[in-house]
Design a protein with these regions (language model features):
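Beta-strand-rich domains and repeat architectures in extracellular enzymes and scaffolds
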Residues: 23, 34-67, 230
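A short helix->beta-strand "capping" segment at the edge of beta-propeller domains
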Residues: 26-46, 381-391
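Blade-loop segments of beta-propeller domains
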Residues: 48-50, 66-108, 114-116
Length: 433
């Protein structure tokens, strides 16, 4: 099947360049780090933690508001509107070109299609790439910007039956369910219950690619597994990571595959009951897949790394309070971040509501004596944790999705610590006295 393709660049609903607004700043009273509020505009949305938000040069970060697409200068953090286009859904920035990719869904009808666009970040000129069927979701762009990848299900199944929409404060599905005796589940349990219902439905799905130049659509793999979270390698244009979605203790979650459907590889194999792995992401050099690993769930916490070339593994251990919804890694791969979690989440952390900076520390050989089979074993380490932001007022139904700035000097995240959702940045270095 070939989708409709439009090669002509067009400028659609482009706003005149706006004056950049300076961010509001303060010093976090508990950590001493400088925090900036970049935007609290209605509908603000900072991209998911493993989506690229930066231009190739690292000078601008893209994000979404109810009015369209905005950019933040990564040196000054001044914010301006790029594209006035209500209804646009921001996808990601290009790895090679200064391009913001976004989608729009046609209004009305059961067969409403989704159109994929590319906007020049400097000129705001827009071109159409392709039209995909209703229910399709574009998740990722490959390293040389020749292919988009997405997934589609044969039918829709709302995760929360009879839901009126999303939680206004968090922008997330308002999961709710009851135990057999009628008692209401906490949010985290209700979410697992609804995810399990979707997994058991075994809805036929497909992963596909779209040629960015021609719009041609090609199938990669079909399955009744719940396929989700596609991520191209940031350096290898044909290597695609994806997941089997559902309760993590039931599924073999993390997989890689080539765009021609070959070399399907399972990244992690469970070794104990209730062991879980997920929230996977690439290292910037494309050599390592990192993921949250718990052995077992809710008891022992690791950030695990898998070398895609050698299958060598490195695991960093975390304390319960340091477990985080999502982790990330700096561009130079020397630092990691974690965005914490609340007491109802999987770690049940009594004091976990912090934005963290992690310094990796290897576990050394005792007396310099290396085991004979050490090279075939998991390389273990720990994290030295530093608290950057007090997230005590955060409602973690809104996931912070922290990411490092390209220069490694800031951590950018989304939070509702002041009552409503906003995009923030925290400086990693302590302010000069």
């Amino acid at each position: 099947m070939r989708n409709s393709v439009f090669g002509l660049s067009i400028a659609l609903a482009v706003a005149a360049p706006s004056i950049a607004a300076a961010p509001t700043s303060w010093i976090d009273a508990k950590t001493g780090h400088k925090v900036l509020r970049l935007s609290d505009a209605p509908g603000n949305y900072a991209l998911y933690f493993n989506y690229n938000a930066y231009t190739p040069q690292g000078d601008l970060m893209i994000f979404q508001t109810a009015d369209g697409i905005s950019v933040a200068d990564t040196k000054t953090w001044a914010v301006r509107s790029l594209l006035h286009r209500p209804g646009a859904h921001l996808l990601f920035a290009g790895h090679k070109t200064r391009t913001a990719y976004f989608s729009e869904q046609a209004r009305g009808g059961d067969d409403a299609t989704i159109t994929i666009f590319a906007a020049d970040i400097d000129t705001a000129k827009v071109r159409r790439i392709a039209v995909v069927p209703k229910g399709s979701r574009i998740d990722t762009l490959n390293a040389d910007e020749t292919l988009l990848a997405g997934q589609v299900a044969s039918r829709d199944m709302p995760l929360q039956p009879n839901a009126a929409g999303v939680d206004i404060k968090t922008g997330q599905t308002a999961y709710a369910a009851n135990w057999p005796d009628g008692r209401p589940m906490v949010y985290a349990d209700a979410k697992e219950f609804r995810l399990n219902q979707r997994l058991d439905a075994k809805i036929p799905m497909e992963i596909f690619t779209i040629d960015v130049t021609t719009g041609q659509r090609r199938s990669v793999v079909k399955a009744t597994d719940w396929l989700n979270h596609l991520q191209f390698s940031p350096t290898d244009p044909t290597l695609l990571m994806y997941c089997h979605e559902g309760p993590w203790h039931r599924v073999d979650r993390i997989w890689t595959i080539r765009t021609d459907g070959s070399q399907m590889t399972k990244v992690h194999t469970r070794t104990m009951n209730m062991e879980i792995a997920g929230h996977e992401f690439w290292s910037p050099d494309g050599k390592t897949i990192w993921y949250d690993l718990q052995t077992p769930r809710g008891e022992d916490f690791w950030l695990a790394g898998y070398d895609v070339a050698t299958a060598k593994r490195r695991w960093y251990h975390l304390d319960r309070n340091e477990w985080s919804v999502h982790y990330n890694v700096s561009a130079d791969r020397t630092l990691f971040s974690g965005d914490g979690g609340d007491s109802e989440m999987v770690a049940h952390a009594p004091d976990g509501k912090w934005m963290y900076l992690f310094h990796p520390k290897p576990v050394p050989d005792v007396a310099g004596i290396r085991a004979d089979n050490a090279d075939s074993l998991i390389e273990a380490g720990t994290f030295a944790a530093e608290k950057l932001v007090d997230m005590g007022k955060q409602d973690y139904k809104l996931e912070p999705n922290a990411r490092f700035s390209p220069d490694g000097k800031w951590l950018i995240f989304r939070a509702n610590i002041e009552g409503k959702a906003a995009i923030y940045a925290v400086e990693i270095a302590m302010p000069r006295s």
